[in-house]
Amino acid sequence: MHSRPNIRFLLNGRDISLDDVGASDTLLDYLRLERRLTGTKEGCAEGDCGACTVLVGRLQDGSLRYEAVNACIRLMASLDGCHVVSVEYLSGPHGKLHPVQQAMVEHHGSQCGFCTPGFIMSLYALWMQKPDPSEDEIETALQGNLCRCTGYAPIIRAAKAITEHGSPAEDALTMERDDITTRLSALQDGKRVDLRKDNSRAILPANTDDLAQVLLETPDATMVAGATDVGLWVTKFLKDISPVVFLNHLEELRKIERRDDHIHIGAGVSYSDAEAILCDEYPHLRAFWDRIAGWQIRNMGTIGGNIANGSPIGDTPPVLIALGAEITLRRGDARRTLPIEDFFVDYGKQDLVPGEFLETIRVPRPGPDARHSAYKISKRRDEDISSVCAAFNVTVQNGTIQSARIAFGGMAATPKRAASAEQALVGQTWAEASLTAAAEALAQDFSPLTDWRASAVYRMQVSKNLFRRFYAEHSGATSDVQLVRG
């Protein structure tokens, strides 16, 4: 396989080629320290505050797409073939303010100003996609941006007023779209990228077959897709992650499509890209999906990464377990498929051998008479980690429960099915008493721990109450449902 020792990308429309790139180098440090583009700020360095928000454009199926991402945890090596847009790009001739900036000024959306560039870039990304967004769409776009002083009301008013100052059709990104597309296409040479800096190494395989070969050659490599977790290993724990194999550029892993009886999801599909199809097939997931992290993280993080990470409090594994998903693992040319729940062996341990990687996820399409719900319990509504996550998939025919798949996160060392609760439901009448009895069976399935997110008692009580909530939502009996109280 032919390789090259450098990454090539565009920065605010300028061609960049770098060969001195370490596996742990971040986009934020490059912008601020190497390019002196200091409009992009460092706040949290963990993808929570949004002060470092930039846009990254990439060709996908030949089409150029821009997304808001967190520069603080976006690793430089992953930018090969991309167009990075920082807040400095928005400046017009003679310092003229961009429509997003002008709206923020006129509606007093900035006070200390530290968070303002990040808000500007998130609103810019939204405005380019939806020039006349609803308030819900604005709030969704700003989930990953925190302001400590001004408050959000003037920022939301500014977001609604952007079109008073200009149209996306007249924006530089729109006017230069064809040129940028052509230039990014010219960067696609089908070669493996192999970067070395001091003792650090980062590899971008040419395709999934090359990925399989690279992992056979370097089975101890850290695999990185969205870097929403690994990025914190770098910024918070100062961990040496080299050698790194990057996955987010591989189009084969970023495909999601409906097939006859299932949804095919490549392991590199982001939360944002999965949302359209998964939430269309399973409408109950829309509210749940909106609770996963913030907009920037959903644009970066991948479904496969959330599974492979193996966290007991990951958001998507309980949902996928309840839906009966299967995953395909690949090592070299060999593949094996297993139910997703069998992948999670113990805390920090997954059924994955050296040199093997998660390639695809297979989610069955909804069956008749199935009732679905998914719930996330956390201290904050937006951009928080789950205390408890639960997903229900129950089939009812003629008033009798025919099958049940119920899974929880935050209740054990791994995402796990509630086998005793499932067994208690099957064959029973669809009634609150049946759900209450099944909830009591949770004590046979789980012995939750106490940590700073929640106590063991709280976790068990809220999990039992989710059975009652599930029944209420699917029976219209909300006023009569009795909740467990400690």
Regions found by a protein language model. Give the residues of each.
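NAD(P)H dinucleotide-binding glycine-rich loop of Rossmann-like/cofactor-binding domains
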Residues: 81-107
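A basic, amphipathic helix-loop patch mediating RNA/tRNA/ribosome contacts
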Residues: 22-54
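S4-like RNA-binding module at protein N-termini
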Residues: 56-87
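Short structural boundary motif marking the start of a folded domain
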Residues: 3-9
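Flanking scaffold residues of small Cys/His-coordinated metal-binding clusters
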Residues: 4, 39, 44, 64-67, ...
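Short, contiguous acidic and Ser/Thr-rich linear segments
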Residues: 14-23
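C-terminal structural segment of proteins
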Residues: 10, 15, 55-59, 68-71, ...
